Amino acid sequence: MSTDQQSSVEDQTVAMVNVRRANFKSFWDKYSDKPDTNSMMLNHSAEELESSDRADILASLPLLHNKDVVDIGAGIGRFTTVLAETARWVLSTDFIDSFIKKNQERNAHLGNINYQVGDAVGLKMESNSVDLVFTNWLMMYLSDEETVEFIFNCMRWLRSHGIVHLRESCSEPSTGRSKAKSMHDTANANPTHYRFSSLYINLLRAIRYRDVDNKLWRFNVQWSCSVPTYIKRSNNWRQVHWLAEKVPAEDGAKGTSFNELVELIKNTWQNEQEAWDAKLDDEKYVWTDKVFSSALTSLPSNSTFFLYTPRTVSPYCHINAHTLAETFNANVWNTEIIPEYYRTSLTKSNNLKDQRVRFGWNQSLTDSVTYWQQKDALFDVFVATEFLSTVDDETIRQLPNVMSDGAKFITLEPVDEVNEAEMKQRIQELGYTLKSFTDVTDQCIEAQEQYFKDHEQLRDEKVIRKNWVLLELTH
């Protein structure tokens, strides 16, 4: 490409970006004469859920004493106020002037806030200058290119071990499919990107940023989960937020380029998610249902269940959280570790609308246990697939810290050899007692065969012909 051609392409790209930002500015200018909570949340019923939603988000943040914070897309400052009450300093930014003026009015009593009117994409801050980058509904208003650029900027702005909080409407608006509640103008195009939740997880995990000192950094994504208020008030599991920490990159890591990440989020990850949606969204039942049924018959109603489904051996080897909730009138938390399967679980929840069932994503069971320890949670029953084969010994020993006294542990394990004595010894070394050991190999193979027959889109999938054992443990 010649210099003139390259210059022409760059000029066209800049022009396209400027048009896009103008469209978004026009989109929000329609609400600028009403700088209130309804406008911030584009929801006629926002006042009913605002305080609860805000409490959910703030409860997920780390302690901010002596910390510096930037609140990007702050609007009228519904989060800025609380952030500034505990943080050392807050920069509150938005690209609608009337919103920032309202923000300044409501926070005039606080002297540790700076305000800036401007686009999030063009925000200028010093490197290593803040401890928390806080956003709430931002990247859905950015193009794929702008989203990647913004995540690079977050990495640059954050100090070592700084935190970024992101929250987005995934796959659909915050109002779900309700046109009555939405303030979106149906007569005009809505420029919002309702991306898959998995795309954000993958982007945060993939980025490797090299700073001016040639040091390489990555994000440790601590968790992803739905915002509880939107489940309770709107039956919407697709209001998702994430917390990620800036940490040194692993040894041997290489930096990721802007173009590489744009291609991944625009095409590769999108296509991969759509392929898994086609296979899993219409799942009628889970093949493990019958296998687990005998071990679960003695469990009391109104229990709290902690599920772990790594799906390492097969995407179809997981636990039917909705069946457990229905059978035992139980509250169920299911930890997924594959972003694409997590997204399909949220879809199923949105369709079935059983508020007793919640799904979270963590990189490992270790992170999930840490998440619940921080919340002082206790569960009555732990049900898993591949628990002993995918979890490190230290985490297995730590798991009882989030389980109640007398809790039951049930796991379906693929094994090379059915050896009860060997399994019993290992379990004892981990601090557990083996109460029941059942060879369910034939049952698992038959269940998989029937499952694939019953799902037309899965007819070509392979049965996992390993040995399988069902274990019941106590601690």
From Swiss-Prot:
Activity regulation reads: Feedback inhibition by phosphatidylcholine.
The biological process GO terms on file are: multicellular organismal reproductive process; nematode larval development; phosphatidylcholine biosynthesis from phosphoryl-ethanolamine via N-dimethylethanolamine phosphate and CDP-choline; phosphatidylcholine biosynthetic process
Can you tell me which residues the record assigns to a coiled coil?
A: none
Can you state which reaction this protein catalyses?
phosphoethanolamine + S-adenosyl-L-methionine = N-methylethanolamine phosphate + S-adenosyl-L-homocysteine + H(+)
> What's the domain of life for this entry?
Eukaryota
The Swiss-Prot or TrEMBL record annotates one GO molecular function as: phosphoethanolamine N-methyltransferase activity
**GO annotation, cellular component aspect:** cytosol
Q: Where are the transmembrane segments?
A: none
Q: Look up the record and name the pathway of this protein.
A: Phospholipid metabolism; phosphatidylcholine biosynthesis; phosphocholine from phosphoethanolamine
Q: Keywords on this record?
A: Lipid biosynthesis, Lipid metabolism, Phospholipid biosynthesis, Phospholipid metabolism, S-adenosyl-L-methionine, Transferase
Q: What class of enzyme is it?
A: transferase
Recorded E.C. number(s)?
A: 2.1.1.103
KO phenotype (gene knockout): Necessary at multiple stages in the worm's life cycle, its disruption alters worm growth and development.
Listed Pfam families: Methyltransf_25 (PF13649)
> Which InterPro entries does its entry note?
Methyltransf_25, SAM-dependent_MTases_sf
Q: What is this protein's function?
A: Catalyzes the first step in the synthesis of phosphocholine by converting phosphoethanolamine into phospho-monomethylethanolamine (N-methylethanolamine phosphate). Phosphocholine is a precursor for phosphatidylcholine, a major component in membranes and a precursor itself in the production of glycoconjugates secreted by parasitic nematodes to avoid host immune responses.
Q: Which family does it belong to?
A: Belongs to the class I-like SAM-binding methyltransferase superfamily.
Q: What is this protein called?
A: Phosphoethanolamine N-methyltransferase 1
| Gene source species | Caenorhabditis elegans
Its organism's taxonomic lineage begins at:
Eukaryota, Metazoa, Ecdysozoa, Nematoda, Chromadorea
